[in-house]
Amino acid sequence: MKKIYLYIVLTLVFCNFGFADSLRVVDGDTIVLNGEKIRFSGIDTPELKQTCMNGDEKVFCGKTAKMLLIKKIGNETPECISEGKDAYKRTLAECFVNGESLSSYLVRSGYAFAYRKYSKKFIKDEEFAKENKLGMWSMKFQYPWDFRKAS
């Protein structure tokens, strides 16, 4: 009887691993969830190698955006609503943790920008961060799209 019980428990444990969500944060606006590369729609974050200047101090604002996202997600699994694919075949989506938009959170924190070229959805969040000098709005920075053009 103990062997049967042990077999059932082990089977349930190993079956659950097959359904476990795999998550990797690539940068501030891109994750890989269960093998699918997801780009947060409507926002743009600094590139990982991009820096900002906080007075005389160089800050890796792209890495800071990534770390902020990792911290916000914690041990949760984001729920993403797909909005199609981009030119690089990534899924464009808005993702949520505990009902809160990760995109809105990043923009309101000042470590992402409303990507007006593609969406107007996060402009109020950006205005809030800018008015309150949050995140990059308290530093000298280059917009991510300008940084990519210059690189």
What kind of region is each of these model predictions?
Residues 2-151:
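Small beta-barrel nucleic-acid-binding modules, primarily SNase/OB-fold domains
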